[in-house]
C-alpha cells in the first residue's frame, strides 16, 4: 500500500539526527505543508477579522450567504444564527458561507464563539441524545479536517450536557497553510449536519438525519496567534455561583426494586441455558447475598450451573461464542469466576451431565420457573386468544409442578411452545405429554409439533393429537411421526382451544432407535474444556489496545483460576497467570500474543508498557472516557482476591490506586446545567469518541460495569475516599445512578447488584477523609507530565491547562497539539500548530478522506473502508489531503508497527509520536522530550520572554537554553514573569 508506514520503511532515531538535536538544540521543524516556519509570537494580537452572525452590517461586510438559517437572540441577549434542517430532513442542514481576512504567510486560525448553555436535552446527561448535531468548517469548498475523531475536528459537537453554563466558550482550528498562502481573503463555510454514531457498520448507521435547528453560532474570528483572546468589550458572561444539588434519593428505592426484580427473574423465570455471563454472575452473587431471594437457595446454584451448561452447548454449536461473544476479550472468564465464588456450595453437581442438550426438550416437567416455567413461552400472536398460562405447583403428575392452561370463552385459546427449539435428525420420533383436564369443551387440549429447517423456515405443521374432553385425570397422548424432509429442529406446542382448564406434565421426546444422539459430557469435563480453550485462545490473541488488554487479562486469570479448582495439573502457575494482569496495567512490559508453544511474540518490542509511568493508559495517546478503566481495575483486583482460595494482591492494589489518582488530575470542576458543583472527565484532549464536556467523574464514574463509589469501597485509599465523599457532598451521587435503576441490560443489572449488595454499604462505613479533587481552584498547584502519552495537565492558580502534544497522530507526526484552557470565566479548546524534531525521512501523505483520517487497526474491520464511509450527498474533498507527515523512529525490536494490519492509512503504533515537541499557547510554553535515550537543548525564546518553570518555581531567562533529559518535560509560564 503506497505511503502506509511499514516496519522496513521506518528509520531508527540515531546518529546525525540525535547528534544535531543534542548539540544544536531543538530544531523548529515547520508544520506539514506550511508556507514558512513559524516564529514565536507575543500574546495579545487583535483578531484579523470578526464575523458577527445576526448583525446585518457585519454579515453584509463579509458577503454572508445563509441557507436554511434564522437569526435568533441567544445567550446574554446576543444575536446568533441557527441552521435549520432541510426538507425533507437529511444528514445535512443549513449553511453559512462568508469571506474572511487571513494572513498570506504562516498559519491562520479560525475561532468560533458558542454559548455554553446549549445542549441536547433529548436524553439524560451522558445518554444517547438524538439531537447531538455537528458543525463542520469548509474553506474554498473543501472540508477542513474530519467529521469524526480527527486531529483537526468538527467546529462543534453538541452534547447532552452544557459545556460552560452561563458563559461563552471558544473553539479554535487551523486553516490549511496551502489554502491561505499568498492570499488576504478566503471563503469559509459552516455546514450543519446530523449526529454520527462512530460504531456504525455502514453509512446508514453512521450518519443520522438532522431534524431540529442547530445550536446558535455567535461569532467567528480569524487570527494568527494560537491563543485566541476576545476583543475588549465583548460580553462573555460569568460562572454561576456553584450550589449543592439536593434530592434524588428515590433512585435508591428504584435500584432496590430493580435488583429484587432481576434476582427473582433469574431464580424463577429466566431460561438458564440462554443466560449471558452477567446474568450468570448476578445469580451467583445473589446466592451469596442475604438481601436476595436467591440467598442460599440450592436452586440458584443449579441454575447457575445450567447457565454454564448453556454456554457450553452454545459454544459447541458455534465457536464464536468464545471468540466473538458479548463477553468480548474476556472469553469464558466469568465461568471461572463464578466457580470460584460458589465452589464451597457446589456439592457433587459437577459430576452430573451437562444439561440443555439441544436434542432434548428443556424443562419437560416444568420443575424450573416461577409464575411461568422456564424454557417455555407464549408466542406474541397467541396472546390474542385471551387464555392464560402458568406454572402450577398445586397440581402435578410427578415432581413439583405442571403447566396450567386456562380459557374462559368459547372462541378463546391458550398456546405455549418450547424454547429454544430442539434439534432433530431424520427418522421416526415419538412426541408425548401427560394431560389432565377440567371442564374442557371445544377442540380441547392437544400437542402439536412444528418443524423447521436450518434457516428457521417452517417445513411441517398441523400434527395435532388431542386428549379427551371434559374432566379427567392424567392421560398420555402421543404422536409418532417421521421427520419431514429438510427439518432439523422443532418446537413442541402445548395448546388448549376452547373453554376449560388443562394441565400438562412429563413431556417426552423419544429419538429413533437407530439414531445416535450426542451424549453431553460430565460438567467437570465440559467446564475444563471451556476454561482451557478460552485461556489458550486468548493467550494467542492478547490485544494491544490497553482497555482490551485489561479485559483479556482478566479473562485469562479467571479461566486459569477455574482450572486451578477443576484440574490443577492444567493450570498455569499463579505467578504466570498474574503476569498477564501485570502486563495489562503496565507493571511489566506488554509482551503481546503468544505462539502455539506459549512464547510471547513481543509485537511492540521488549519495553512497551500498556500504562505510562504517569499512570495513564495508552490508546495510542491520552483518552478521556476510554481511559477511565477503574471498573476493570476493580474487576481485575477482585478476580484475585474474592471467592474460594482468594489471595491478597497488595502489589495490584498499590498500582491501581496510582492509576486512579492519575485520572484525578484530569478533571474539570465546574457547574452542571442547574448550576450545581460538579467534577467532569477531561475529554477535550482525548483521542477516542470524546464528548464535550466529559462525563461526571470524581474517582469512579458511572458506566456499564462501574458505579461512582466502587473504587473507594474496594481500594479504601484515603484520597480516593475523599474524592468520592466530595461527590456525595456535592449532591452528584444520585444523578449518576439512573443508569443502574433503569437500563434493562443484564450487564447493568450486575452493576446495580454490586452497588447495592457490596459497594454502597462498604463506602458508607469508611471514615471521613479531607482529600478533594486536585483540579478545584482551592487546591494546590500541580504539574503532571506524561511523555509516553505526550500530554500534560497543569493547575496554575485559577487556570487549568491540558495539552496533548501527541494528538491523533496515527500514521506520522502531524505537528498538531490539542489544548484545553480553563478559567473561572471561560474555556478554550484548540487544535494548534506545534514544532517537533527527531523524526525520520520516511513519510505518510494525508488521504482525501472526510470522516476519519485513518483505517481501523483490526483485521476484522475489513468491511469498513479506510477513512470510513463517505457521508451522504455530493462528494466532498479534504482540505488537508496531501499534507506530508514524517514518521517518528520506532525501536529496533518492533518488527511491524502496523501489527500486521496493512490497510491503507491504518492506525499505526509509535510512528506518530515525535521524540521532541515544542508547543506555545498563550502564556504557556511546553518542551517535551519523549525519547528514552537522548538529551535536547531548548532554543532561545526571545519573543516568548522570561518565564517561570512551573515545577521548580524558578525563573528562566529568555536567552537561557536548558537541557531536557530523556522522558522529561519543561512547562514554562510567563503570565507572572514581571
Outline where the language-model segments fall.
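Short carbohydrate-recognition loop motifs
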Residues: 68-92, 390-411
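A short beta-strand element within beta-rich, extracytoplasmic domains
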Residues: 102-127, 427-437
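Extracellular carbohydrate recognition and processing domains
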Residues: 144-177, 457-486
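Extracellular polysaccharide-recognition and catalytic grooves
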Residues: 313-345, 353-355, 522-772, 782, ...
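Extracellular and organelle-lumenal recognition/adhesion modules and their flexible linkers in secreted
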Residues: 356-518
Amino acid at each position: 500500500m503506497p505511503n502506509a508506514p511499514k516496519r522496513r520503511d521506518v528509520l531508527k532515531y540515531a546518529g546525525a539526527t540525535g547528534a544535531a538535536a543534542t548539540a544544536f538544540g531543538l530544531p523548529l521543524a515547520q508544520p506539514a505543508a506550511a508556507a514558512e516556519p513559524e516564529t514565536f509570537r507575543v500574546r495579545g494580537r487583535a483578531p484579523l477579522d470578526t464575523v458577527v452572525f445576526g448583525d446585518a452590517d457585519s454579515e453584509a461586510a463579509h458577503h454572508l450567504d445563509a441557507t436554511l438559517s434564522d437569526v435568533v437572540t441567544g445567550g446574554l441577549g446576543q444575536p446568533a444564527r441557527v441552521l435549520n434542517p432541510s426538507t425533507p430532513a437529511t444528514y445535512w442542514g443549513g449553511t453559512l458561507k462568508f469571506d474572511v481576512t487571513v494572513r498570506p504567510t504562516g498559519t491562520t486560525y479560525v475561532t468560533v464563539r458558542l454559548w455554553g448553555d446549549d445542549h441536547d436535552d433529548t436524553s439524560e446527561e451522558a445518554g444517547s441524545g438524538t439531537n447531538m448535531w455537528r458543525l463542520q468548517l469548509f474553506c474554498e469548498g473543501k472540508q477542513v479536517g474530519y467529521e469524526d475523531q480527527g486531529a483537526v475536528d468538527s467546529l462543534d459537537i453538541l452534547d447532552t450536557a452544557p459545556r460552560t453554563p452561563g458563559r461563552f466558550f471558544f473553539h479554535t482550528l487551523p486553516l490549511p497553510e496551502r489554502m491561505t498562502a499568498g492570499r488576504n481573503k478566503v471563503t469559509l463555510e459552516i455546514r450543519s449536519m446530523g449526529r454520527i454514531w462512530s460504531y456504525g457498520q455502514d453509512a446508514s448507521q453512521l450518519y443520522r438525519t438532522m431534524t431540529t435547528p442547530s445550536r446558535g453560532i455567535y461569532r467567528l474570528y480569524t487570527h494568527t496567534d494560537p491563543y485566541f483572546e476576545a476583543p475588549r468589550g465583548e460580553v462573555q458572561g460569568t460562572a454561576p455561583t456553584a450550589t449543592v444539588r439536593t434530592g434524588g434519593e428515590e433512585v435508591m428505592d428504584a435500584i432496590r426494586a430493580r435488583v429484587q426484580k432481576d434476582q427473582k427473574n433469574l431464580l424463577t423465570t429466566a431460561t438458564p441455558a440462554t443466560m449471558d455471563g452477567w446474568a450468570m454472575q448476578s445469580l451467583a452473587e445473589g446466592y451469596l447475598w442475604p438481601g436476595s431471594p436467591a440467598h442460599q437457595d440450592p436452586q440458584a446454584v443449579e441454575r447457575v450451573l445450567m447457565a454454564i451448561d448453556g454456554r457450553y452447548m452454545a459454544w459447541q454449536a458455534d465457536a464464536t461464542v468464545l471468540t466473538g461473544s458479548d463477553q468480548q476479550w474476556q472469553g469464558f472468564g466469568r465461568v471461572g469466576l463464578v466457580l470460584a465464588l460458589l465452589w464451597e456450595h457446589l456439592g457433587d453437581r459437577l459430576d452430573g451431565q451437562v444439561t440443555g442438550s439441544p436434542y432434548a426438550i428443556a424443562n419437560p416437567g416444568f420443575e424450573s420457573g416461577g409464575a411461568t416455567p422456564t424454557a417455555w413461552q407464549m408466542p406474541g400472536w397467541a396472546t390474542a386468544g385471551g387464555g392464560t398460562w402458568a406454572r402450577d405447583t398445586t397440581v402435578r403428575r410427578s415432581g413439583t409442578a405442571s403447566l396450567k392452561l386456562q380459557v374462559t370463552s368459547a372462541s378463546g385459546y391458550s398456546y405455549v411452545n418450547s424454547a429454544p427449539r430442539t434439534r432433530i435428525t431424520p427418522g421416526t420420533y415419538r412426541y408425548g405429554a401427560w394431560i389432565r383436564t377440567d371442564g374442557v369443551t371445544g377442540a380441547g387440549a392437544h400437542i402439536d409439533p412444528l418443524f423447521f429447517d436450518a434457516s428457521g423456515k417452517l417445513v411441517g405443521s398441523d400434527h395435532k393429537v388431542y386428549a379427551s374432553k371434559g374432566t379427567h385425570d392424567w392421560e398420555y397422548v402421543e404422536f409418532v411421526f417421521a421427520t419431514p424432509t429438510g427439518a432439523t429442529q422443532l418446537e413442541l406446542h402445548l395448546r388448549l382451544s376452547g373453554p376449560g382448564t388443562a394441565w400438562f406434565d412429563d413431556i417426552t421426546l423419544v429419538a429413533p432407535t437407530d439414531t445416535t444422539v450426542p451424549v453431553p459430557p460430565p460438567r467437570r469435563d465440559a467446564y475444563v474444556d471451556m476454561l482451557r480453550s478460552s485461556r489458550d485462545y486468548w493467550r494467542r490473541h492478547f490485544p494491544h489496545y490497553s482497555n482490551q488488554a485489561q479485559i483479556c487479562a482478566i479473562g485469562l486469570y479467571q479461566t486459569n483460576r477455574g482450572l486451578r479448582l477443576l484440574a490443577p495439573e492444567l493450570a498455569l502457575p499463579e505467578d504466570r497467570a498474574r503476569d498477564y494482569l501485570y502486563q495489562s496495567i503496565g507493571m511489566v512490559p506488554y509482551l503481546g500474543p503468544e505462539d502455539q508453544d506459549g512464547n510471547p511474540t513481543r509485537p511492540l518490542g521488549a519495553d512497551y508498557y500498556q500504562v505510562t509511568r504517569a499512570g495513564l493508559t495508552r490508546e495510542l495517546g491520552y483518552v478521556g472516557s476510554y481511559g477511565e478503566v477503574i471498573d476493570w481495575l476493580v474487576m481485575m483486583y477482585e478476580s484475585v482476591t474474592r471467592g474460594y482460595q482468594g489471595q491478597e494482591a497488595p502489589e495490584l492494589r498499590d498500582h491501581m490506586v496510582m492509576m486512579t489518582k492519575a485520572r484525578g488530575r484530569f478533571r474539570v470542576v465546574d457547574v452542571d446545567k442547574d448550576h450545581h458543583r460538579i467534577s467532569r472527565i477531561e475529554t477535550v484532549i482525548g483521542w477516542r469518541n470524546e464528548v464535550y464536556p466529559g462525563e461526571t467523574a470524581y474517582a469512579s464514574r458511572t458506566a456499564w460495569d462501574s458505579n461512582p463509589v466502587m473504587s473507594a469501597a474496594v481500594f479504601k485509599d484515603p484520597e480516593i475516599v475523599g474524592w468520592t465523599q466530595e461527590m456525595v457532598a456535592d449532591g452528584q451521587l444520585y444523578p449518576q445512578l439512573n443508569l443502574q435503576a433503569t437500563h434493562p441490560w443484564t450487564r447493568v443489572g450486575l452493576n446495580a447488584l454490586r452497588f447495592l449488595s457490596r459497594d454502597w454499604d462498604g463506602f458508607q462505613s469508611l471514615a471521613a477523609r479531607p482529600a478533594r479533587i486536585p483540579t478545584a481552584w482551592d487546591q494546590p498547584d500541580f504539574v503532571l507530565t506524561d511523555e509516553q502519552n505526550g500530554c500534560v495537565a497543569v493547575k496554575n492558580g485559577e487556570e487549568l491547562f491540558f495539552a496533548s502534544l501527541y494528538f491523533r497522530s496515527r500514521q506520522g507526526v502531524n505537528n498538531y497539539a490539542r489544548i484545553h484552557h480553563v478559567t473561572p470565566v471561560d474555556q478554550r479548546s484548540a487544535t494548534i500548530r506545534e514544532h517537533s524534531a527527531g523524526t525520520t525521512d520516511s513519510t505518510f501523505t494525508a488521504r482525501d478522506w472526510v470522516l476519519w483520517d485513518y483505517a481501523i487497526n483490526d483485521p476484522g474491520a475489513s468491511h469498513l473502508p479506510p477513512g470510513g464511509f463517505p457521508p451522504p450527498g455530493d462528494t466532498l474533498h479534504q482540505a488537508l489531503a496531501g499534507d506530508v507527515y514524517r514518521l517518528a523512529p520506532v525501536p529496533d525490536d518492533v518488527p511491524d508497527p502496523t501489527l500486521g494490519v496493512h490497510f491503507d492509512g491504518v492506525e499505526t503504533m509509535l510512528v506518530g509520536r515525535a521524540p521532541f515537541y515544542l508547543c506555545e499557547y498563550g502564556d504557556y510554553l511546553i518542551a517535551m522530550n519523549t525519547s528514552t535515550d537522548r538529551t535536547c537543548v531548548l532554543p532561545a525564546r526571545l519573543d516568548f520572554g522570561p518565564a517561570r518553570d512551573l515545577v521548580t518555581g524558578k525563573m528562566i531567562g529568555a536567552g537561557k537554553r536548558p537541557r531536557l533529559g530523556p522522558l522529561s518535560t519543561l512547562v514554562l509560564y510567563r503570565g507572572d514573569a514581571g
